[in-house]
Amino acid sequence: MIVEVVTGADERPEARVVDIDDLGRCVLALGQVTDDEAAEVLERSGLGRMQDAGTAQLDAAALRAAAEPRATAADWSAQWDAMVEAARSEGRLSADGASIRVQVESAAGA
């Protein structure tokens, strides 16, 4: 699953959740946006917040709400639970389970 922050309509940055059936990884991918634009768009969308230039905290409930209605994998919910458990075991899930720490990478082709 990828949360992208890319330049959208009218050259205004927007956040969108893509590759929703690929729960083997969860990352934040930035297109041609500044760090400030990425931080603003993430917070405005409710999907999360930047932690630093290389990591972000994604809101688990908001991410699931954005992705699940569009999921096509029959076992998507079980895959989601496995992804969250993997984040917990790797120390990337907040103590309250509300956010998942993810890597920031470039949105190739964005």
Feature annotation, model-predicted:
Residues 2-62:
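Short helix/strand-capping turn motifs
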